[in-house]
Design a protein with these regions (language model features):
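Conserved AMP-binding/adenylate-forming core of the ANL superfamily
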Residues: 13-43, 51, 55-57, 61, ...
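Conserved AMP-binding/adenylation subdomain of ANL enzymes
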Residues: 146-163, 170-210, 265
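Conserved C-terminal "lid"/linker of ANL adenylate-forming enzymes
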Residues: 360, 386-391, 399-401, 418-465
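Conserved AMP-binding A3 loop
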Residues: 24-26, 123-147
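AMP-binding/adenylate-forming catalytic core of the ANL superfamily
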Residues: 211, 307, 341-425
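Conserved ATP/PPi-binding loop(s) of AMP-dependent carboxylate-activating enzymes
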Residues: 288-292, 300-329, 367
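Gly/Ser/Thr-rich phosphate-binding loop
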Residues: 209-213, 222-281, 295
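Flexible, low-complexity linker/hinge segments
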Residues: 103-122
Length: 465
């Protein structure tokens, strides 16, 4: 299993899709190689970028195999992107679209292409989910995808007896890594696109044992009272800090959820909390490295990583080469600088705290926003909270935004914080809003804290605080 075509061809997995069809992974490998031959006839050449804006379906997997077989590069395009966002990504990568209807008719009549792509070839481009600037273009070679699939399968304890649901979008590392790990372990794979009702029904019907997703996804399943009792391990990404109780709620429903860590540059499922640990431990993002060849260090609070899952570099404008200068700025002596604040637990285990840019610097101390948000979420009627810091003449001051359908008594909220937090952590304002500004990504919806800071600055300027 040295490259992506072999990952499919040598897997014992059977893959079930939303339309009811079931295909072996080997069938998908054959069909993908036929699709590669058809794409060659359409003028695609080794190194060309293909824009893939597809749901989780068989076509998506065939085209991923086709890219690997022919040496094309798959550019993952979020299905929720607007036309302007698609045009920007396609322009920056020089990616070409695929005429899918013609391809469905054409590839069936083609002889499978003898794969020419190698494990060292560029394979897939993910976009980072930055909330303050244009997304960076993260390039992975086949090598990092396949090697990490094997490591993640081992780290999650997957085997051919397991049933894995692949529900996160394949256009992001969370979805693709969950899929490839299942292929590496020859699991039965249930491919679907998330809907709180139908996904819950499918988990019960297929007796899914493993599924990875965002905290919001599991929250919505639990709200629907989905039967999750078959889930022995669900890795969850912590994108919504207001859902701190998600692990305990899932346990009450018979499912084991556990925190993990990953990002596009090192892929999802880079580390995992012990599923046998208690709910408090499993609720903490981070965990133990899944690869024996991976390592981490913490420098001035920043998490830095090495390992076989590491990306090849950030793609340059135009898509043909790696931007060496941009890539080098994110490395320190061979260690990838994540931009995340973390704390060491042992040589193989760490706890993710926050994005360094999101950490509040208050009263001369670093404060994780979640520390204040947790107190605010104790208030009856407060569904969620986000806290940012605003620079004032007397120093940085915290400002809180809450989602409270029936409103919130700001004075009471501030007094509550004063009883439980040091004075410098107490928000100077607690503002109720209808929803947090956010940006979608293939890995989960992320709150735009930069916009919250602008809103906070405007609120303080208006109030004179």
């Amino acid at each position: 299993m040295n490259n992506v075509v072999e990952l499919f061809a040598e897997s014992g997995s059977t893959v079930r899709f939303d339309d009811g069809q079931e295909l072996s992974a080997a069938d998908l490998a054959d069909q993908g190689c036929r699709a590669a031959a058809w794409l060659r006839r359409q003028g695609f050449r080794t190194g060309d970028r293909l824009a893939l804006q597809l749901p989780n379906d068989a076509d998506h997997l065939r085209l991923l195999v086709a890219c690997a077989a022919a040496g094309f590069v798959a550019v993952s395009v979020n299905t929720r992107y607007t036309d302007d966002e698609v045009a920007d990504l396609v322009g920056r990568t020089s990616a070409r679209p695929v005429e899918l209807e013609d391809g469905r008719r054409g590839w069936r009549h083609c002889t499978p292409l003898d794969p020419v792509g190698t494990r060292d070839d560029p394979f897939v481009v993910f976009t980072t989910s930055g909330t303050t600037s244009r997304p960076k273009l993260v390039l992975h070679r086949q090598r990092s995808i396949v090697d990490h699939a094997r490591d993640a399968a081992g780290g999650f304890g997957l085997s051919g007896e397991d049933v894995v649901m692949a529900v996160m979008p394949f256009g992001g590392t969370f979805g693709l890594t969950s899929l490839t790990a299942a292929l590496a372990a020859s699991c039965r794979i249930v491919v679907t696109n998330f809907h709180p009702v139908t996904t819950g029904d499918l988990i019960a019907a297929e007796q899914v044992t493993h599924v990875n997703g965002s905290d919001d996804m599991f929250h919505r399943l639990l709200e629907q009272r989905a039967d999750l009792s078959s889930i022995r391990l669900g890795g969850y990404g912590r994108f919504n800090t207001s859902l701190d109780g998600i692990v305990g709620r899932a346990q009450d429903a018979g499912a084991v959820l556990t925190g993990l860590y990953g990002m596009s540059e090192v892929q999802a499922l880079f580390s995992l909390r012990d599923p046998a640990a208690g709910t408090s431990q499993r609720s903490r993002p981070g965990g133990t490295l899944v690869s024996s060849e991976a390592s981490y260090r913490i420098v001035d609070g920043e998490l830095q990583l090495r390992g076989p899952s590491l990306f090849a570099g950030y793609l340059a404008e135009g898509g043909a080469t790696v931007d060496a200068e941009l890539t080098d700025r994110h490395f320190d002596d061979g260690w990838f600088r994540t931009g995340d604040l973390a704390e060491r637990e042992d040589d193989r285990t760490f706890e993710y705290v926050a994005r360094i840019g999101d950490v509040l610097r208050l009263g001369g101390f670093l404060v994780a926003p979640a520390e204040i948000e947790t107190v605010l979420q104790r208030i009856a009627g407060v569904d969620a909270a986000q806290v940012v810091a605003v620079d004032r003449p007397d120093g940085a001051r915290p400002v809180a935004f809450v989602i409270a359908p029936n409103g919130v008594d700001e004075t009471v909220a501030i007094e509550l914080c004063g009883r439980h937090l040091a004075r410098y952590k107490v928000p100077v304002r607690v503002i109720a809003i209808d929803e947090f500004p956010s940006t979608p990504s293939a890995n989960g919806t992320k709150i735009q804290r930069n916009k919250l800071r602008m809103m906070a600055e405007a609120a303080l300027s208006g109030s004179g605080a």
